């Protein structure tokens, strides 16, 4: 319960270089020197001791770090460590899953789900958003999700065209 209270305070309080890292250290997160943690960063409440953050790293707004996953009442919970190396930059709105190591000097693009290890000094993330399909049936209350899906048409790009 105490860990949840500290996590909630760290989620909202200012001072990303001092107060937020200190609150997470009290919870059991291992945090190096000169680490910046933005507001609205969530670090796992059940196993904060499984998170290690190296010196000179930055974790941006609305990033979530999980060290456990719950798969339902018939399966055992999965718990793992998250190791964030030195000089790492994590962009906003990232999700970091258990059993992940982010190497020293890595940069994680905003909006990325990190589900496997990231090598050191690597820019890691999904490609820029782009067109996925042509919408012929709008996804509105007047149509079902099935109608929407059936109405999707492929978009052919020069890159995907045969013979190019």
Task: Set out the residue ranges of the language-model regions.
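Short loop/turn motifs at secondary-structure junctions and domain boundaries
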Residues: 21, 42-45, 74
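Blade-loop segments of beta-propeller domains
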Residues: 69-72
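C-terminal segments of enzyme domains that contribute to small-molecule binding surfaces
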Residues: 77-91, 95-96, 127-164
